[in-house]
Every structure is written in C-alpha cells, then in structure tokens.
Amino acid sequence: MSRGDSMLRFEIKDRDAAGRIGKLEVNGKKIETPAIMPVVNPKQLIVEPKELKRMGFDIIITNSYIIYKDKKLREKALEKGIHRLLDYDGIIEVDSGSFQLMRYGKVEVTNREIVEFQHKIGVDIGTFLDIPTPPDAPREKAEQDLKITLERAKEAESIKQIPMNATVQGSTYLDLRKLAARKLSEMNFEIHPIGAVVPLLESYRFKDVVDIVIASKMGLRPDRPVHLFGAGHPMVFALAVAMGVDLFDSASYALYAKDDRYLTPQGTKRLEELEYFSCSCPVCSKYTPQELREMPKEEREKLLALHNLWVIREEINRVKQAIKEGELWRLVDERARAHPKLYAAYKRLLEYYHYLEEYEPITKKSAFFKISEESLKWPIARRAKERAEKVKAKFPESIPHPIFGEIPKYLSLTYPFAQSESEEDFQIEKPTRENAILYIMAIAEYQFGEGAGEAFRDAEVEIAKTGMPRQVKKNGKRLATVRAEDGLLTLGIEGAKRLHELLPYPVMRVVVNKEAEPFARKGKDVFAKFVEFADPKIRPYDEVLIVNENDELLATGQALLSGREMVLFSSGRAVKTRRGVEEKK
C-alpha cells in the first residue's frame, strides 16, 4: 500500500486504545474527530442546521437521494447548492440512497447519476450507491451484493470529483468484510464507512458489531477515517472509538424525540417514566419532566431533540477527554456495564489483542487502574506482562506485584508496574548505587528489545535526592534520562548512537527520505509524508532511531504513530524529534 493523492487531509493529534483524536480537513473546513454528524432530513427539519452549527456540530449528514427524488428540492439544490439550501456553512456529507435500498429494496437512480448529482450540488463528502446486505443474509446474496458494490466503487472512483465515502459491506460474513475493506483500500477514496450495522445495533447485537468493525479495520488502511454508519446512540461511542471509529451519524436524536424518548449515555428512557432530569443541558436546566410532558407535541419534540443532541455532543467530548488522559479503556469499562449485551461486546473486543496492541501507546499520562478483571486484559497490561517475561530471562531476580504477579525487580520503577493502582499497594524498590545500572539495562531491554541493555552496561547512573535514577552518562556525555513520570528512558544522541550500533536493522528505525534528512539532523520533527520505511514493531510513544536510507543515524525522538501508520499517513507528525546529530546544544 502506498500513499494516495487525497482531496481530504486527516492526521492524528492524540490517541488511546485504537481510538484517535484527529484533524480532518476538507474544502478548507476543519473538524476534530471523533465527531458526530446529526442526520438532517431536508423535508423535516426538527432542528435547523444553523442551530446545529451554533451547538458545535461542524459536520452534518443528509440524504442526496431524498433531495434528488423531490423535484422542488432537486431544482433548489442545483440552483443554490446544498449549503445554501440547508443554510449551513459547515461540512456536509451525504448518503446516496443505500439506506432506502436496504429498507425498501429499490431506489430510482443509478450509481453514476447520484455521484454526479452530489458533485453538482456542491457536497463536501459524497457516497456512491453501494448495496447494503442485511445481517444473516444467505452467503450467496452477500457475495453478489459485494460484487456489485465493488463494481460501483470502481465506477465512482473513475468519475468522482469530490472526496467520497467507500462503504465496507459484506453482511455478517467477516471474511467478506475484510475482503471489501482491502479492495476499497486499494482505490482512491477518502473515508470508509462500515455499513448495514443498524439492524444489529437496533437488536443489541453489539458483539456482532465488534466482529464486523474489527474485521473491516483489519482490512482498511489506518490513514483513512472510519465512519460507523447509523451508530448514533451515546452508549456505544466509547466502545466504537476504542475500536478505531472516527465518525458517527445520528438520526436517533430526532427519531427518539418523536417517540418521547430521552437519551442518556447509559441508554434510553421514556419521558413518562422520569420524575427528575439528571442532565444539566440547557433544556433539562430549564424544564422539569412534568413540564415537558404538558407541552404541545411539536414543542416537546423539539426540546427533546435538543436534549438528545446535547447528550450526544457531551459523550463525544467525554470520549475525547478520556483519550487525552489515557483513560479510554476505563470509560469503555464503565459504559459497558450499562447493558449485558454491551458488556459482552466489550469482552469480545478484548479478544482482539493483536489488532489492538499495534495502536496501544507504550506509555500513558494516567496510572494503570485495576478496576475490573477485564482491565487485566487491556492491551497495555498484556503487553507489559509479555515484555516483563522476556526481561525476566536475563534479569531473573523478581518481586511480587499485586496486579502483574512476579515481575523483574529492576522494572519496579517502570510503567505500568510502578504507576498502577489496585486494592493492595505496591512498594517500589529504589536502586542503590551498586545496582542502579541493572535497572537501566532492564528498562532498556523492556523498552527497546533483547540485547538493548548492553548499550548501557558501562554507564554511570546519577541518583536524584528522591532516591530515583535520573541521568545516565558516560564520560560526562548523556546517554539517556529516566523519566520521572513513567520510569522509561528518553535517549540522548550518545545513547541513540550506542543503540544504533547494537540493534540490527530495522529494529526501532524510522527511515526518512533525502528531503527530510537535513531537517532531522538538526532536530526538526519528522512528518509522515517523508517516512520511507519504519519498523512495523514500533508502537505509539516509543523512543525511536531516525535514520536515512543508508541506515545512518540522524536523530532520536518519540514516535507519535505506529510503524505501519508512519508509512501510510501523508499528513501530520510521525516523530517528535528530541535530538539531532547536528543539533546545537
């Protein structure tokens, strides 16, 4: 897979689990992901699009087929453009009629016609007319539908003039989902929705949704945003984002309001059952449930829709804050307990360790909290135990840990072992001047792999007044620093040189092209578009060696992407460079 020319820019700004906070830019308009698109029906505007914009929704989705089918709407859209038609200056994405195709079995438009129509009315993100196969359909039907979808994808690719969705289909057949994802990833599209999951969500088959999303994600390029079509209930946001979903859409805010239903992050309640509002949004702060019940239907519907939107927006922000703090798994764990089927889906997700581990940061801002038995299966915990076992082979002296069992004594300062909380306390063993170097060597083995400890065998370790190791030097030159926050090593350029000599290519390498080489030497950050190759075992926030195509060391820094992501992303930073070989002190 190579970097393709894209009409849309997407880069990762922050991350946790397989979730990411991203910046998506199209037609000069920017949004931050994860983001939710309220569904706007141009025939039934419960909440005006400009009001949605004021509430902070900078992207909406509407249905181009509904506009196309209505003669008056079609003529207005062609004359004014969709932004003036809806009186909305944010990003407008459109569906193509696929949902109607799934619900009613047919649509009166061709794939080419709807793609060309979307361009003519000036949408920001279009969608070609894929075939959504419902769950549990006969395999023969799923295969035939997917064949047509892929044919239409090729047609759309050849004529599209706007950024476009390419929806992953395949019913509940995971191999077909993965196949569709791989085929669509090879084409020039910008966003990949995962389609035909609404029936599963409506019937609380969340475990099947997890299987479908992961199968799709495993086949998709990581540099393209993923949209979970029809997922608009806040109870699933944390779980979906942890899987790697970036975009959601919600018609539920309006549909539930029509039925006097009230959204919460834990589920849906009927207005007639409520005595109190636990929410503090503008609607719930002003009215009581009784007052809403006594209102005329139309007024009540609008206010309930507004409440539902505030709850949706609040939960998206809560998910993003959890990512910033390295707490997304804790939020997923909490939300999963709202419903047994959601809890089962959470447990299923944790079975996909090898997928999740690639994107799991190597260190986090927050301590590891053992809040449940499931937390021991979080990727950060499983990886730590696996790495500790390898270190134990070389440093067999061990101590008991209340969460992780027997761990190497010399890793007792290191994340997540020292930075963890459970029912029982863990007492770290501070180094002595005699054994401090063993701590450094063990940390290097844990962090950089087998044999890395030898790079520091002859080093001197400075112990701070707190009794903790800090600077690692040789003949006055800094090799590394033990970070106070997580007990891991930040490399100095001399330490990077030693590791570079010791570790075989391509271990911990990020290879940059000739254009970026002089900037890396001077300590400038490395952007993804200049990365030629990266060790696929690099994980987010690893300390890495930046080299040129001849494997000459240029700099050292902290990876912001996984190794595979660095090679595929064309926007954003790949490595935060700490020190270049030619950088002046």
Curated annotation (Swiss-Prot):
Positions contributing to Zn(2+) binding: 279, 281, 284
GO molecular function list: pentosyltransferase activity; RNA binding; zinc ion binding
Every PUA domain range: 507-582
Cofactor notes: Binds 1 zinc ion per subunit.
Protein name, UniProt field: tRNA-guanine(15) transglycosylase
Cofactor: Zn(2+)
Role according to the record: Exchanges the guanine residue with 7-cyano-7-deazaguanine (preQ0) at position 15 in the dihydrouridine loop (D-loop) of archaeal tRNAs.
NCBIfam families, per the entry: arcsn_tRNA_tgt, tgt_general, unchar_dom_2
Organism phylogeny: Archaea, Methanobacteriati, Methanobacteriota, Thermococci, Thermococcales
E.C. designation(s): 2.4.2.48
CDD domains in alphabetical order: PUA_archaeosine_TGT
UniProtKB keywords: Glycosyltransferase, Metal-binding, Transferase, tRNA processing, Zinc
Biological processes annotated in GO: tRNA wobble guanine modification
Name of encoding gene: tgtA
UniProt record similarity statement: Belongs to the archaeosine tRNA-ribosyltransferase family.
Active-site residue list: 95
UniProt cross-references to Gene3D superfamilies, sorted A to Z: ArcTGT, C1 domain (3.90.1020.10), ArcTGT, C2 domain (3.10.450.90), PUA domain (2.30.130.10), Queuine tRNA-ribosyltransferase-like (3.20.20.105)
Coiled-coil stretches noted in the UniProt entry, renumbered to this chain: none
Catalysis: reaction(s): guanosine(15) in tRNA + 7-cyano-7-deazaguanine = 7-cyano-7-carbaguanosine(15) in tRNA + guanine
Binding site for substrate: 130, 196
Gene Ontology cellular-component terms listed: cytoplasm
Domain of life the protein comes from: Archaea
Pathway given in the UniProt record: tRNA modification; archaeosine-tRNA biosynthesis
